[in-house]
Design a protein with these regions (language model features):
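A short acidic/small-residue loop/turn micro-motif
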Residues: 51-52, 112-113
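Solvent-exposed alpha-helical segments within well-ordered globular domains of core cellular machineries
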Residues: 3, 7, 24, 85, ...
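Hydrophobic, helix-rich cores of sensory/ligand-binding and other regulatory modules
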Residues: 107-110
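Short acidic/polar active-site loop segments enriched in Thr and Asp
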Residues: 32, 93, 154
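A conserved regulatory-domain signal marking ACT and ACT-like small-molecule sensing domains
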Residues: 126-218
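Short beta-strand/turn micro-motifs at beta-sheet edges
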Residues: 116-121
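N-terminal, positively charged regions that mediate nucleic acid binding
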Residues: 26-30
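Bateman/CBS regulatory modules and CBS-like beta-alpha motifs in cytosolic regions of diverse proteins
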Residues: 1-25, 36-38, 43-44, 48, ...
Length: 218
């Protein structure tokens, strides 16, 4: 999940704030997008730097630019790889994060994402991500690793999320035929809850993933 990388250091503007002040916020934080909220801190939309610069009068309030704001955000319990899809699809410098009531809670940026997944120096050919949900007492990494390696896969990195009596294990794998690995794990009664792939044929995550990582590594 993205909860643990949410930043809250940005003073987000409201609709009645003047656009010129938003440019100063962007410069301070080295970003080209800023979330806009209403008086109740409800997320309105994301405004970009170019839209503000192209205003007829940047002294005007942001409310005059409401039609230019993009309704792009993630909820705080979203998976980290949904953030990669969002960043790469919309070429964003930050992603606004909201709660279940659409209240703005913070943002994440590109660097936060890559540091979270710990893949900054990885070869992304044949990279796949699988998420296994299981009870803590059933978690034996050596067995999972054995099943993966027996099917010509390799664990590049992993991280874990613990909720109550369960643990979600996120595995970054190098494998050509990840579907075989998934079927093997399921045959051993492992619950695969999510899958992501750098393969452009995947419906979940395409070659924008590799482009995004390569961009961050330049």
């Amino acid at each position: 999940m993205i909860k643990d990388i949410i930043k809250r250091d940005l003073s987000v503007p409201k609709l009645n704030d003047s656009a010129i002040n938003i440019l100063a916020v962007m410069e301070e934080h080295k970003i080209s997008h800023v979330p806009v909220v209403d008086e109740n801190n409800k997320f309105i939309g994301l405004i970009d730097e170019l839209s503000i610069i192209n205003m007829n009068n940047i002294q005007h309030p942001l409310s005059s630019m409401k039609k230019n704001m993009k309704n792009i955000f993630l909820v705080e319990n979203a998976h980290i790889f949904q953030s990669i899809q969002t960043v790469t699809s919309h070429l964003l410098s930050i992603i606004p994060i909201v709660d279940e009531n659409h209240i703005y809670v913070g943002y994440i940026n590109q660097l936060d994402i890559i540091q979270k997944i710990g893949l900054s120096h990885t070869n992304y050919d044949n990279l796949n991500i699988i998420v296994i949900s299981l009870h803590k007492k059933d978690y034996v990494l050596s067995e999972i690793s054995r099943l993966i390696e027996e099917n010509n896969g390799k664990i590049i990195t992993l991280w874990q999320e613990i909720t109550n009596d369960k643990i979600n294990v996120h595995l970054a794998l190098s494998c050509i035929k990840c579907d075989i690995i998934i079927k093997t794990l399921e045959r051993y009664e492992y619950n695969i809850t999510q899958t992501f792939s750098s393969d452009y044929t995947s419906n979940a995550l395409d070659d924008r993933f590799e482009s995004f990582i390569n961009y961050l590594n330049t």
